[in-house]
Curated annotation (Swiss-Prot):
Annotated residues for binding of (6S)-5,6,7,8-tetrahydrofolate: 109-112
Species: Halalkalibacterium halodurans (strain ATCC BAA-125 / DSM 18197 / FERM 7344 / JCM 9153 / C-125)
Record's function text: Attaches a formyl group to the free amino group of methionyl-tRNA(fMet). The formyl group appears to play a dual role in the initiator identity of N-formylmethionyl-tRNA by promoting its recognition by IF2 and preventing the misappropriation of this tRNA by the elongation apparatus.
Protein name, entry field: Methionyl-tRNA formyltransferase
NCBIfam families hit by this protein: fmt
GO MF annotation: an example: methionyl-tRNA formyltransferase activity
Stored PROSITE patterns: GART (PS00373)
Amino acid sequence: MKIVFMGTPDFSVPVLRRLIEDGYTIAAVVTQPDRPVGRKRVLTPPPVKVEAEKHQIPVLQPEKIRDEAELERLFSFEPDLIVTAAFGQILPNALLEYPKHGCINVHASLLPKYRGGAPIHQAIIDGEKETGITIMYMAEKLDAGDILTQVTVPIADDDHVGSLHNKLSEAGAALLAKTIPPLIKGELQSIPQDDQLATFAPNITREKEEIDWRKEGERIYNQIRGLHPWPVAYTLWNGKPMKIWWAEKVSSPKKEAPGTVIALEENGFLVATGDETALKVTDLQPAGKKRMLARDFLRGAGSQLSVGSVLGGQDGS
């Protein structure tokens, strides 16, 4: 049986690697084009391309998978099954209908919850205690195909996008390994999604990154870890954005205005929120500076920060 694998970021790599380890013939890998990365805009291949080339697997990098010429190239590999994991483009119907065993997708949520491009971020931001992996048939509508298998993955209180991403990626690879054999034998019964239960996790926008200190401390904490290590939550200090890489929840009976610095400690500073849960900022990045520990910030660039200083807007927003 020949498989074409379609994926792009780090999340996709363990999935591809597991297919290779399980002995499937990977006829080709389809991924996004190389993109400029970093301040120096260095042209960088997607992680999936790097992994595929280690195993001498042909790599296709179409700008638009819907282009007729790109589809013909893909059809030339005659896949019996197409597996996608965070590919980044919606597949056209002509491609969905081509493989004998269909096109299946590894999605990082328990569908129909969190359809879209940022399900890991959004689950943490929303304070979920669990999420999971769904393997489903693909449809032209985003993340709306019939469900084949699912597995639940708990979210710890100190999980962030990076740690949960790694858990889900490995869980996705393991679930796929269990799903393919009964799928190709015709032993799996798919289940349609209930669109009325669907929630959405669109890509993160700049507006979602700014901290509103008027919110409850728990919600801000979830926002910080739901944006770590990318794109990172931020607040304003002296009118300039300061990234908040990490913070800890601290019970505080003080009733200072949200955004007010209420204490300086050896390893961080406490900021008032909209309730009695303050946040101790321990890891940050001032505008124009490198990421640093809060204790180093307080000794240097942040020496002007004091009890009573206000982060964010004048009202903590």
